[in-house]
Design a protein with these regions (language model features):
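S/T-rich, low-complexity, solvent-exposed segments of bacterial secretion/appendage proteins
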Residues: 1-561
């Protein structure tokens, strides 16, 4: 047997034990012992599980690394080309060729953003399918292990000897199962194998086996997760970090650590570019003498209700908070409501709960509004205790990134409004239909926050609510809006001083390039999270994926070396 089975997978060398026959007729075979060490096998299976996870992770992350590192097909050269076309426009603001060049580079850039998101989304869907395939193979293996436990017990009872062939099959199955997932093996009295998940939930217990299922995540219908079906037939979703070893663990870990993060970073980059550019474009005037509109469109945030919510309340609207896009982060969020009806908002990337000052919740008796991290959600009622929601602000934003302009005359290269003064403000923006009255406005802010507006009687809002300059005062952080022009006051004047701001419709002509220059300057502005330029953010993402790829390869080489 030892010679004929030398290449048989799972075969263990056998040792024949001889003894004197009872009839003094020479020797007889007393036993055939299988040479198998459970401790060595356990260590080998653990190493196999770890190596399999790393190999799977390395195979997946290398695809993203190759995508991002391609200097010709990457986003960096296309963003550079887009801003270079703005430089050409600034040099000849009324030239049709310069305007057509800008639209062409914008279309090419947005198409590449969509292609990147599509590639990453295909990987998400591919992982969903691979998880389902792995679960099928795992269930087949655990069912066979339970069957072998029964057959081995029966064989021992019949002959009183170890059925070596069946034992080899069982240990080979455990080794193959270890390639797919990390597991816990316990040998009970009677030599039966019990297999359980790392969290202790049984998969094989004697002659019984329990099934895993690839199920739709209860918090995200686009995501496949592991479900555990107990003896009562109840299906419960497992935490995504339950399995960390084997092919299955490699897929789950890669998705959580790298794929989700990269897709969110691409989305954050797209939203930051679109929001910043649209804001500046609305401050411009086109060749028809009209205010500029949104140059780009972008996908809005996604929000999902947990399937076990009991309050019957859904998120009816999810949108970006244009005044607070510097708070936008490349992460998903989990919202959970407490007994008092207040939300608790947690970042999914690091598990940090947002402080009370980082979100705002308001329920008016009919509709709830929650703002945090650069997004605003509208609820159609008051969620009850335990209700949960999954929010993906930027995950699929790039999938719907498009250029809105096809008419060359609609490019707002000239300046729509003029502004000057020493008032400390930021986020100056023109909403649709701004300055329709044609008035020029003069504002004066005192150290105590009192605001004088000329002409008097002009409608003013503060943080979205009516503001009366006669009785109300301004504090740092307030957002004011007058005739469609909005801005945030960042600081009050020093003691004994006042600050002023004047704005109105600018005089513009076909040769005006002031807004084209302002849009070009966005290339170096800190548009991403208020801390990084577009090129810096993209370079950081490429570097992060590259570093992760190298770490995985080094660890894999160490395991296989």
């Amino acid at each position: 047997n030892n010679i004929s089975n030398v290449y048989t997978p799972g075969y263990n060398r056998e040792l024949t034990i001889l003894g004197q026959s009872r009839a003094d007729a020479g020797v007889q075979v007393n036993d055939i012992q299988r040479q198998f060490n459970h401790y060595v096998a356990s260590q080998l299976n653990a190493a196999t599980s770890s190596s399999s996870a790393l190999k799977t992770y390395e195979n997946q992350i290398s695809q993203i690394d190759n995508l991002l590192a391609d200097r010709e097909a990457g986003l960096a050269p296309l963003m550079q080309s887009f801003f270079s076309s703005l430089e050409d426009l600034a040099g000849a603001p009324s030239d049709p060729a310069a305007r057509q060049g800008l639209l062409g580079s914008a279309d090419t850039m947005t198409a590449q953003f969509r292609a990147f998101d599509g590639y990453l989304q295909d990987m998400q869907e591919g992982i969903n399918g691979q998880i389902a395939d792995e679960v099928t193979q795992i269930n087949n293996a655990t069912e066979q292990l339970a069957t072998l436990n029964r057959e081995i017990a029966l064989a021992r009872a019949r002959s009183g000897k170890a059925p070596n062939s069946l034992l080899n099959q069982r240990d080979q199955l455990v080794a193959e199962l270890s390639e797919r997932m990390n597991l816990r093996l316990e040998i009970q009295d009677g030599k039966s194998y019990n297999i359980s998940l790392p969290n202790g939930q049984p998969l094989v217990s004697g002659t019984n086996h329990y099934r895993l299922e690839a199920m739709e995540s209860p918090s995200d219908p686009q995501r496949t997760v592991l479900g555990y079906k107990d003896s009562g037939g109840n299906l419960v979703a497992l935490s995504e970090d339950t399995i960390t070893g084997g092919t299955l663990g490699g897929l789950m870990t890669f998705r959580a650590e790298t794929l989700d993060k990269t897709q969110n970073q691409i989305g954050q980059l797209a939203v930051s570019l679109v929001a910043g550019f649209n804001q500046q474009h609305r401050l411009g005037m086109d060749l028809n003498g009209d205010q500029g509109g949104d140059f780009f469109s972008i996908g809005q945030p996604k929000a999902y209700s947990h399937e076990r919510n009991t309050g019957g309340v859904d998120v009816t609207s999810a949108s970006f908070d244009s005044a607070n896009l510097d708070q936008l982060r490349a992460t998903d969020y989990t919202i959970r409501f407490d007994a008092a009806g207040d939300p608790q908002v947690t970042r999914n990337d690091n598990g940090r709960a947002l402080t009370a000052g980082e979100f705002a919740w308001d329920f008016d008796g009919t509709v709830g509004e929650l703002s945090f991290g650069g997004v605003t959600l509208i609820f159609d009622g008051q969620p009850v205790e335990g209700d949960r929601y999954q929010v993906q602000p930027v995950r699929r934003a790039a999938a719907e990134m498009n250029s809105n302009i096809s008419d060359l005359d609609k490019i707002a290269a000239g300046s729509f409004m003029r502004s000057e003064g020493d008032m400390a403000i930021r986020n100056l923006r023109a909403n649709d239909g701004a300055l329709t009255t044609g008035s020029a406005y003069s504002l004066e802010l005192a150290e105590n926050g009192s605001l004088t507006v000329v002409p008097g009687g002009s409608p003013v809002t503060r943080n979205g609510e009516a503001f009366d300059p006669v009785t109300d005062t301004v504090v740092a952080g307030d957002t004011l809006e007058i005739d469609g022009i909005a801005f945030e006051v960042t600081a009050l004047p020093n003691a004994g001083e006042t600050a002023s701001l004047e704005f109105g419709v600018a005089s513009s002509g076909t040769g005006d390039n002031r807004n084209a220059l302002a849009m070009q300057n966005l290339q170096d502005a800190s548009l991403v999270a208020g801390r990084a330029s577009l090129s810096q953010a993209y370079a950081g993402m490429v570097s992060d994926v590259g570093n992760r790829t190298n770490i995985v390869k080094v660890n894999l080489d160490a395991r296989q070396g």
